[in-house]
Structure formats: C-alpha cells, structure tokens
Amino acid sequence: MKKGIFLSIGIAVLFSACGNSIDEKTVKKYENQLNQTVKQEIASLSQDSGIKIEFSDFKCNADGDFIACLSPNFKTLTKDNNDEYQELFQAKNIKIRSNEIYKGKANASISIKEYYNDLFKNQKSIQSNLVFEDFKLGEKVVSDINASLFQQDPKISSFINKLSSDSYTLSFDNSINKQENNYLDNLDIKFYNAKLNFNTNLNINLKEDLLNYLDSKGIKFNTQTLVMDKQAINELLNIANYEQASDFSNTIQKYIILNNFKIDSTLKTEGVFSSYIATAKENLQTLKAQSQNEEQALIFDKALAILNNITQNDDYKLNLDLKFKNIPVSDYSTQGIDSIEKLSINNQDATEALKIILPFIMFSMLMGGASF
C-alpha cells in the first residue's frame, strides 16, 4: 500500500515540469498540476483498496533553480474487522523539491527526447527530492508488529516497541546526469532517526535509445499541461503488466544497465541482542569446524567474519555493496549469477560465497512454491 502512495507522488514529481524563469505564474501552474495528479492517484488507490487518505494540497514556491512544495498532515487509514478506520501511518509534512523544469518555447506536445534535451541545456543534473517528515506508524500497526514477533525477552520486546513507535524521516533523492549516449540515474532512499539509519542506493545507466523507444510508443510531453501523455503511459504499463514476454519487456531491458546497489545501515541496539549474537557466533564456529568440504567452510568463515564486523560494538553497522557487470538487464536471464561482478559486505568479499549459496536458496524457494 505504501508503495502505491510513494509511486503516486513520485510520478507527480517525475512527470511534472514548468516554465522558463520560475515566476509566480509558472509555480502556480506546477502546483495545480501536482495537486491534480496526486488527487487522481489517491482517488484511484482509495477506490481499488478501500484505503482512506487524508491529503492537504501542496503549496509551492520558487527556490533558486528549483520549485519546492509542501503538503502538511498526511495520513492513511484502513478499516479493521469492526469496520472502523485505523491509522496505517502519518507524516507531519510531505516535501517535494525539483529542478525538472521545462524551459523550451514549444506550445504543444514534444517527444521525450526533445524534452530531456531541453532539460539538460542549462543544467548538468536533474534532481528531484521527496521527503516524509515525522513519518510514524499507526498504533494498531505497531501493536500488530509487536504481536507477530512472539518475543519472550522483555528487553528486546521493549526495544522493538520503541523502534516501531518512533518518528522517522523518509526521503527519496533521484538525480539524472547526461553522459555521451546514456543517462546516469542515481536513486537514494533514506529512513532514519537518532536510533536507526537505513540508506539504500541504486545506480543505473539508461541508454539514450530508451527515449527513442518511448517516442515510438507515442509517449510525449505536453508543454501546456506539464505532464506526459497519460493514456500512452497507461497503455505501455498495461503491456508490461500483462504481457511479460512482450516487445516491452524484451526491449526495455536492453536499454537498462544496473551498475551497483548499496545498503548502509546503523542501529543503536543498546546491547539487547548481545546474548543472541554470542550464540550465533558460537554456532557458526561449530558449523565451520564440522564442515564436510571447503565450500561449506568458506561460507561459515565468511558469515562469521561479517557478523563479527557488524556487531563489533552495540552500534551495529551493515555495509553492503553489490556490483553488476556492464551488461544490459536483458542478458541476466542467460548470465544468471554471473551477472554479479562482486558482492562486498562490511569490506568482506562475499562473491564466491554468494555463488555457492544462492542456488540452494533458489532451490528452497522453488520447493516451497511447489508445496503450496
């Protein structure tokens, strides 16, 4: 459900732009289109899922080369078994800031390639930022989380309850930079407060031919309404959803190259997991000693080294860096695990261990699916 809300607002950021000098008229036009798009997406989501969303209109203003917008008091609610609304989550403010501003002179629809060429005429990077301030789960959600853990240790139960009850900042930062024949797209997602800091990063290359493909599918940018052709987009997405082996899925993947995916996370545990971590380390030592072959020993040795590094003090730190080969996503079906160039976890090279263990994970998943 949350994914749908984030996607709704993200689409509004990605497919909204405005005029040349960011004057008051341009800002107002951007503001109106943003609110209209978000309301349409919320109405569709509410109709399909029965979720109630309390949303206040964005108010926008010029901020240098950017337009900054704010919407206060965001809430999502859903009905429980007693047909009463329960809060899923809320945010004190939603903030959007973007320099994706069309500065051309066209008065009609233009191709996607024309649109991006214009965007990069006077700026090296297109940046969009979406922030949920004081993001907090509803009381019923927190209660359900705690009930599902079946945790007997009162210290851990109290710790998890506080962690799930806290307020956080949730942010999405996306930047696109033009290179010779492609676009470098960098997405950062951050979820943090004083106790937990969880960051992910995805870095990809989009080939310029992707824009030509979208143009061939009739997707254009309307310079008057400041949005992409919604009907053409929906038609393209329908193909993606219902015809997985279609021209869309086969062609689009040829234009996308994953560079790397990262996770950087810190959790202040206050030492509540110490006894469990000690037991886990002892078990890994035992399994390593009892290994039947070198491959098993490698897996347990790497796991132990990584666990030691993550838990060397009460502030647990996880750093994961997954690098992919310089091949299009369309080649992954034939390359398989070899699509991965290197996996590092807390500066430990876990590539070979991953290649050994992943087939067993996939087999377990298939067997689990078969028994369903």
Curated annotation (Swiss-Prot):
InterPro entries: JLPA. Keywords: Cell membrane, Lipoprotein, Membrane, Palmitate, Signal. A lipid is attached at residue 18 (N-palmitoyl cysteine). Its main location: membrane. Disulfide bonds: none annotated. Residues 1-17 form the signal peptide. GO terms for biological process: cell adhesion. This is Uncharacterized lipoprotein Cj0983.
